[in-house]
């Protein structure tokens, strides 16, 4: 039905007759000539109909937005004065010779013009229309190019594309599982996989030493702009490769993607330990485009007569750190109060500040509500350490170390945006040497990555004796403050795996019930293995500049995990529930509802 895609017609086709199919993007009647902007997934081209062909002209005059049409016409160059540099096809137009309406369109329920606003609910309810818009179509096409490039790279490096089960067993991986009741085994449930983690490890044990899969994963968790209940991973696992080799190979793949699809040279990725990232940036996924860093000053304020500072400064678990913001002295009191309110979201109790109005005037050039608690020597040392200059502001965080890191790290990002401090387009890095475990709110321990991550250079006995000192052989790839992917060397013997389970409060009986198949498999010559999983949706979001992963998925869910298009989730047929042996507990209706 077509000879070319609309967006592919160019100056090389001048003088040729082409056949196109697509949708009417816009139609204009200017002085007895109909200009038709015709659109398909590859772009838009202008088709011109004049009255010399009365029957065709009459049909062209009747067209409305989103009519589905087929046209035949002659490609001709536009006059220089009419060239549209903003269009891929802007050097040419098509003189329409034939026109067939393949289907008409009812009045549209959403605005198709990119400059017109639609609500998120409208866009998802009429997603098939939303996806016709060029900016959305471009992202879906780009996504396909990314997955094709990933497959080419991995296939070319000896990786095998192997599918793993979707109906599997519930295992504790940090989020709630989506459960699927079994009709055959009444009262028992499958779980949709949060990741293929255990199956890809089992594939390593099976001898398939290089595996990959572009795979759907499912997590029943609270959603944010970069989270969906079902999402896609580029999942990779290898045997007989060290963490350094896995990082080198996946970095090569990532650099290749950016070069091929964006013509961007990312260069070699720097390394940073988890401890350094938290100390300097308050985040384990720092955005290195932002030049601001957290600066520790606990040693300077241990003796000051101000409990807000000296308390955390003398607490082994406390921290006092500052941000020095160039040009920040122009912040009004109201703006500073807004910053103080902002950090409370992250557990901070408030925010002290100090403006450097005139460095040459000494203490007289300093303005701060806490200045009365600070000696001239302390202020001088503070200015020297931060490098603050006239016109800058210093913001203080003082609390438990984890609160200071989270609150000041978030404030660092906000200030970087507010003061337009971000430099460069792309800043990748590897974050390494993560703690093996971290404390839970009730004082217990949980795995920072997952319970199958191996420690660096520790025996099972050493690990159980001092688990909080353990460093995992794990690595995260970070780009512009977003975690693109994370991975680790895996545990490959049953003694170490059992030790980790015990540290996490999983006794031997529970471990055998939930992970007996894994512990058994680890007994039969399991090779050393390691891997990494990328969040495909997040990669596409970053590469296309989209504001949400919903804008790079064909049919995403809302932030409440619903689908307005199909009205999912929905109620099950009572007959099906009986067959499954499932009864539904109706929510309680409160008085007045």
Swiss-Prot record:
Gene3D superfamilies: Bira Bifunctional Protein, Domain 2, GAD-like domain, Nucleic acid-binding proteins. GO terms for molecular function: aspartate-tRNA ligase activity; ATP binding; nucleic acid binding. Keywords: Aminoacyl-tRNA synthetase, ATP-binding, Cytoplasm, Ligase, Nucleotide-binding, Protein biosynthesis. It is an enzyme of class 6 (ligase). GO terms for cellular component: cytoplasm. Its main location: cytoplasm. Its EC number is 6.1.1.12. It is found in: Cytoplasm. L-aspartate binds at residues 173, 219, 449, 490. PANTHER family: ASPARTATE--TRNA LIGASE, MITOCHONDRIAL, ASPARTYL/LYSYL-TRNA SYNTHETASE. Belongs to the class-II aminoacyl-tRNA synthetase family. Type 1 subfamily. Homodimer. Catalyzes the attachment of L-aspartate to tRNA(Asp) in a two-step reaction: L-aspartate is first activated by ATP to form Asp-AMP and then transferred to the acceptor end of tRNA(Asp). This is Aspartate--tRNA ligase. It comes from Shewanella piezotolerans (strain WP3 / JCM 13877).
């Amino acid at each position: 039905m077509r000879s070319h895609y609309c967006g592919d017609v160019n100056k090389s086709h001048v003088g040729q007759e082409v056949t196109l199919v697509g949708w009417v993007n816009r139609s204009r009647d200017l002085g007895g000539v109909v200009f038709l902007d015709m659109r398909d997934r590859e772009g838009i081209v202008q088709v011109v109909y004049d009255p010399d062909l009365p029957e065709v002209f009459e049909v062209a005059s009747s067209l409305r937005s989103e009519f589905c049409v087929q046209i035949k016409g002659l490609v001709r160059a536009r006059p220089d004065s009419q060239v549209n540099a903003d269009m891929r096809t802007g050097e040419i137009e098509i003189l329409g010779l034939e026109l067939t309406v393949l289907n008409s369109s009812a009045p549209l329920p959403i605005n198709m013009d990119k400059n017109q606003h639609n609500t998120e609910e409208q866009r998802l309810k009429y997603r098939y229309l939303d996806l016709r818009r060029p900016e959305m179509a471009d992202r879906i096409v780009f996504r396909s190019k990314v997955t094709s490039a990933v497959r080419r790279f991995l296939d070319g490096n000896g990786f095998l594309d192997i599918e793993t089960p979707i109906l599997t067993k519930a295992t504790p991986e940090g989020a709630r599982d989506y459960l699927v009741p079994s009709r055959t085994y009444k009262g028992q449930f499958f779980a949709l996989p949060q990741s293929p983690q255990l199956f890809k490890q089992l594939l390593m044990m099976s001898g398939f030493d290089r595996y990959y899969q572009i795979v759907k994963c499912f997590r029943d968790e609270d959603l944010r702009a970069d989270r969906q209940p079902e999402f896609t991973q580029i999942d990779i696992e290898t045997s007989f490769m060290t963490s350094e080799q896995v990082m080198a190979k996946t970095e090569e793949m990532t650099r290749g993607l950016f070069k091929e699809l964006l013509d961007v040279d990312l260069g070699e990725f720097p390394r940073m330990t988890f401890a350094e990232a938290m100390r300097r940036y308050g985040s384990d996924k720092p955005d290195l485009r932002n030049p601001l860093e957290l600066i520790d000053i606990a040693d300077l304020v241990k003796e000051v007569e101000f409990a807000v500072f000296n308390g955390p400064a003398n607490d082994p678990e406390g921290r006092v750190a500052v941000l020095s913001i160039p040009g920040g002295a122009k912040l009004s009191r109201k703006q500073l109060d807004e910053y103080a309110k902002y950090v409370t979201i992250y557990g901070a109790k408030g925010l002290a500040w100090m403006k450097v109005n005139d460095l040459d005037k000494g203490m007289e050039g300093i303005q701060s509500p806490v200045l009365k608690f600070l000696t001239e020597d302390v202020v001088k040392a503070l200015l020297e350490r931060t490098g603050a200059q006239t016109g800058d502001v210093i913001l203080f965080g003082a609390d438990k170390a984890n609160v200071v890191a989270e609150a000041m790290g978030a404030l660092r990002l906000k200030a970087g945006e507010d003061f337009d401090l971000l430099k460069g387009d792309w800043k990748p890095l590897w974050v390494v040497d993560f703690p093996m475990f971290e404390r839970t709110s009730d004082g217990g321990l949980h795995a920072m990555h997952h319970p199958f991550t191996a420690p660096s250079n520790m025996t099972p006995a050493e690990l159980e004796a001092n688990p909080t000192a353990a460093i995992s052989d794990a690595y995260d790839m970070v780009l512009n403050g977003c975690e693109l992917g994370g991975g680790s060397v895996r545990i490959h013997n049953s003694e170490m795996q059992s030790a980790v389970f015990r540290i996490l409060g999983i006794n031997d009986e529970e471990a055998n019930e939930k992970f007996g198949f894994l512990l058994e498999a680890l007994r039969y010559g399991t090779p050393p293995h390691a891997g990494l999983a990328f969040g495909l949706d997040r990669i596409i979001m970053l590469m296309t500049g989209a504001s949400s992963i919903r804008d790079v998925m064909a049919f995403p869910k809302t932030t409440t995990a619903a689908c307005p298009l199909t009205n999912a989730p929905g109620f099950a047929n009572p007959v099906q529930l009986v067959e499954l042996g499932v009864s539904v507990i109706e929510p309680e209706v409160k008085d007045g509802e």
